[in-house]
Swiss-Prot record:
GO terms for cellular component: host cell cytoplasm. The keyword Magnesium applies. It is an enzyme of class 3 (hydrolase). GO terms for molecular function: ATP binding; hydrolase activity, acting on acid anhydrides; metal ion binding; RNA binding. The active site is at H231 (for ntpase and rtpase activities). The lineage of its organism: Viruses, Riboviria, Orthornavirae, Duplornaviricota, Resentoviricetes. Homooctamer. Interacts with VP1; this interaction is weak. Interacts with NSP5; this interaction leads to up-regulation of NSP5 phosphorylation and formation of viral factories. This is Non-structural protein 2. Keywords: ATP-binding, Host cytoplasm, Hydrolase, Magnesium, Metal-binding, Nucleotide-binding, RNA-binding. Its EC number is 3.6.4.-. Its main location: host cell.
Amino acid sequence: MVSIKVSLADFIVKTDEGWIPSDNCPALDRFKTKTEKELLDSIKREGADRASIRKQLFLTPISNKRLTQIGGVPVRDIRTSTTIPSSTRNLITDWLLNIFNDEESGEEVENAIASKYPDIFCSADKISRVAQRLENRRDRVHEDGFRILSATMLAIDSDIATEGKCEIVRATEDAIIAKFEPVSEHLCIGNPRGVFYKAFPIKKEQPMVYGIKALLGISNRDFIMNHGHGHLRTVPYSEINNAIRSFAKKNEAEIKRIRSDSLSPNAGEKFINMCDMLLQKEKIETIIAKIMKNDKN
């Protein structure tokens, strides 16, 4: 099982009057606007850029026949069946509505989704950790929502200010290291992840010498991965299987880009070997077995 995803459409939908909360009512799926029908037809074609079409569907006002007493029903192709705790749903929905319905920046947000966001699907774990920040009324997440959303959706590289809830545990000359505790049960989407750490370089494109030594020491030499978003992340041994399977879903060009990224050598030989094995089309089970065998204490 790979990482769980949620969609922005699980929380909000667009209408002719603005953005409103999402609702789930399969009985109303039959009602679609002409534009929605055209986009849904195009998403089924061979070679279609499904992520781009999903973004268009998300930014298209829904049929007014799919309005309920709670909100609006997104088309099936842009929503997920992921179970989202009510606390997380309420926090994220209100946060997104404030961002998207803002008179000054709402249009900019929609333009960014169309041109810069890779998709409207994102990590459920990331969303859960944003919800943790939203519980704190003094957190900057309330004022800097657009930038934090962009980092959550992988449209920009994240940093300490735009990450989900975490604690800074170490700072070296070349890196800042943050600790990510398991998400609180009432906010957690899916199974909770173990403790992990991220190292953020002080200067981009510059190797982290002292930071990596600190990261290895703090994490008890956990497997380290570079996902190509400007930082390195540790992976607990029990989660390596899922982490590699999720990474393997990236296309070949993306894996090559990450393999040659300036941070990748800092992740260590095992990570480089994993990238090479994926590019050589080795069986995923073989890759996982080799990495996990080498990673045992």
